[in-house]
Amino acid sequence: MSQPPVAVLGAGSWGTALAMHLARQGHRVRLWGRDPEAMAAMAEANCNTRYLPDAPFPPGLEPTADLDAALRESSCWLVVVPSQAFREMLQKLAPYRDDARVLVWATKGLEEHSGQWLHQVVAEEMGVNFPCAVISGPSFAKEVARGLPTALTVASTTPGVAERVAEWFHGERMRVYLSDDVLGVQLGGAFKNVLAIAAGISDGLGFGANARAALITRGLAELMRLGDAAGARRETLMGLSGLGDLVLTCTDDQSRNRRLGLALGRGESLDAALAAIGQAVEGARTARMAVSKAAELGVDMPICHQVHRVLYVGHSAIEAVGELLGRDQKPEF
C-alpha cells in the first residue's frame, strides 16, 4: 500500500524546492499554488517556469491549484507561504484537520499585524495540541532544487513529531537535526533576514569584508539578547537555524534580503529595489517586528533599529552607519 501524499502549500521558489526534495525521497507530493494558470504551466513544463526553470520536477510531484485535491488523503501539510498569508492558509486547512495529519511550516517571519510568532498563530487556528513542527536552516531554494547538500533543523514540542518530519526530509543530500526549541528556531530564521539587509547595505556602500564580519558578529549578539529575553535557548541560536542561516544570508547574493540591502546601499529606493527583486523579502516586514519586539522585551538591537530607519523613517544608509559607529563605547560581552 502506497504512503499518503505530502501536500506542499505555496509554489514559490522555496516551496517548489522542498517539494522536489520530498519527491526525490520517494514521497508522492502535491504542490499547491493559488494561480491556476501558473500551476497548469508548471504541470506542462514539468518545472517551476518562473522561479526554478532549470530544475525539472522529479517523478511523483504533481502541481495543482485545487486545494481540496492537494489536501485530500495527505499525511503532512508543509506550509511555505509568506508570513502575511500564513494565518489565511491555516484557516483554509482547519476544516481538514485531524490527529493523523502533521502541520509543518518553512515560512520565516512573524505575523505583521499582531507581532505573533507563527507557532502562536498555529495554536490559535489549529488548536494548541495539533501536531506541528517548524523546519529552518541555512538553505537556498536553487541549491535544494539541484540536490546540493543541505542541513536543516526541525523543531517541535509534540512528542515524536520532529522525528517523524526529519524522516521525511532526511536523505543522501539533506541532513536534518532535531530540536524542541520551536521559538529559538523561528527567532533565528526570522530576524537574520533583517541583519542580512544590514550586511547588504554595508557591501552596497563598498565597506568591505571587515565591516561585513563585524555586522554578522554584532548581529548575532542582537539575536542572542532577543532570544534570552524571549525565552529561546542560546545553543539554538548558535546552530543551523541561527548562526548558520545568518552567515549564509549575509554573505551570498542568492539572498533576497541581502540583495535588497545592496540596492539600498547603492542609493536605490525601497520601492524600486523590491520591484526589481520581484519576490517576497521577509526582512523588510520583519524589521518592523524587530523594533517592536526589542521595545516590548527591553532589548538593545541597534543594527535592526538602523535597518528599520533606512527602510521606513527616511534615513540614508550612510547616516545609519554613522549612528552605529558613533555609539558610546561598551564591553563586547
From Swiss-Prot:
Pathway: Membrane lipid metabolism; glycerophospholipid metabolism. It comes from the Bacteria. InterPro entries: 6-PGluconate_DH-like_C_sf (IPR008927), 6PGD_dom2 (IPR013328), G3P_DH_NAD-dep (IPR006168), G3P_DH_NAD-dep_C (IPR006109), G3P_DH_NAD-dep_N (IPR011128), NAD(P)-bd_dom_sf (IPR036291). It catalyses: sn-glycerol 3-phosphate + NAD(+) = dihydroxyacetone phosphate + NADH + H(+); sn-glycerol 3-phosphate + NADP(+) = dihydroxyacetone phosphate + NADPH + H(+). Its EC number is 1.1.1.94. It is an enzyme of class 1 (oxidoreductase). One of its GO terms (molecular function) is NAD binding. Transmembrane segments: none annotated. Keywords: Cytoplasm, Lipid biosynthesis, Lipid metabolism, NAD, NADP, Nucleotide-binding, Oxidoreductase, Phospholipid biosynthesis, Phospholipid metabolism. One of its GO terms (cellular component) is cytosol. It is found in: Cytoplasm. The keyword Transcription regulation does not apply. Belongs to the NAD-dependent glycerol-3-phosphate dehydrogenase family. Catalyzes the reduction of the glycolytic intermediate dihydroxyacetone phosphate (DHAP) to sn-glycerol 3-phosphate (G3P), the key precursor for phospholipid synthesis. This is Glycerol-3-phosphate dehydrogenase [NAD(P)+].
